């Protein structure tokens, strides 16, 4: 199994308290990350602000040796087609070749935040991935709050995963967005995901995105690797909002040693 390193310092890490990257900051950090050898650099969310869009346009002029630039976004809004969604169209305009979009997995958020039916959420996941794939993008799908969603309604969380895979996502990223998981929970849930994928003949690569509110983000990521998860979403020094993410600077040396 080849492990791929997906650095989200410039997107998720930029949400840290007292951190505000300029366009030039992001470009220089991206060049350093490329020199370091990471596979993917999530440069920002082009649909959220002009600064991030400008960063993508500047980054498109770089000749990177190792990394691919990734544009972040979300599934389409309710009541509109994917091609009408400004957030998805911003990804197209970013000049990136890889998109990482997130969508709801926890039914509580589907019903209370999005205010849509479970079926409508599944349709938004499918529509958004198919739209970007149709435009030539490699699409990673972040299953936001996957672990909480799984604990609340396993069947629905796995259905979100299945729909994303069938729509053409090349990586299904299991997210502990609240950061509350413990290593034994990660071991159990990822094992069940593997069984579900085997049973349903889903061969899509798995990724992991862990927050550190419980203090176990790096350990949880390590557990996921042992269960065959290939894409690791990390930040330099674990920088991100609240308590941080899995730490690239700790995890890579640990992986080298195993």
Predicted regions and their residues:
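Catalytic cores and adjacent flexible loops of soluble metabolic enzymes
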Residues: 1-258
């Amino acid at each position: 199994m080849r492990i791929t390193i997906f650095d989200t310092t410039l997107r998720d890490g930029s949400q840290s308290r007292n951190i505000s990257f300029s366009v030039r900051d992001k470009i220089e950090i991206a060049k350093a990350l490329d020199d370091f050898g990471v596979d993917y650099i999530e440069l920002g969310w082009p649909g959220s602000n002009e600064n991030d869009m400008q960063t993508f346009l500047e980054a498109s002029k770089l000749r990177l040796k190792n990394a691919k630039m990734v544009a972040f976004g979300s599934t389409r809004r309710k009541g509109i087609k994917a091609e009408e969604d400004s957030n998805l169209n911003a990804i197209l305009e970013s000049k990136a070749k890889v998109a990482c979009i997130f969508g709801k997995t926890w039914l509580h958020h589907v019903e209370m935040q999005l205010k849509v039916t479970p079926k409508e959420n599944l349709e938004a996941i499918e529509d958004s991935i198919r739209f970007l794939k149709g435009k030539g993008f490699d699409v990673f799908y972040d299953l936001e709050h996957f672990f909480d969603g799984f604990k609340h309604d396993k069947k629905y969380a796995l259905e979100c995963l299945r729909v994303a895979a069938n729509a053409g996502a090349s990586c299904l990223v299991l997210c502990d967005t609240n950061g509350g998981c413990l290593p034994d929970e990660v071991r159990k849930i990822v094992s069940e995901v593997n069984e579900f994928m085997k049973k349903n003949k889903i061969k899509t690569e798995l990724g992991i995105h862990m927050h550190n509110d419980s203090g176990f983000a790096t350990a949880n990521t390590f557990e996921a690797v042992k269960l065959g998860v290939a894409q690791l979403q990390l930040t330099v020094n674990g920088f991100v909002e609240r308590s941080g993410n899995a730490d690239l600077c700790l995890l890579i040396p640990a992986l080298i040693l195993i």
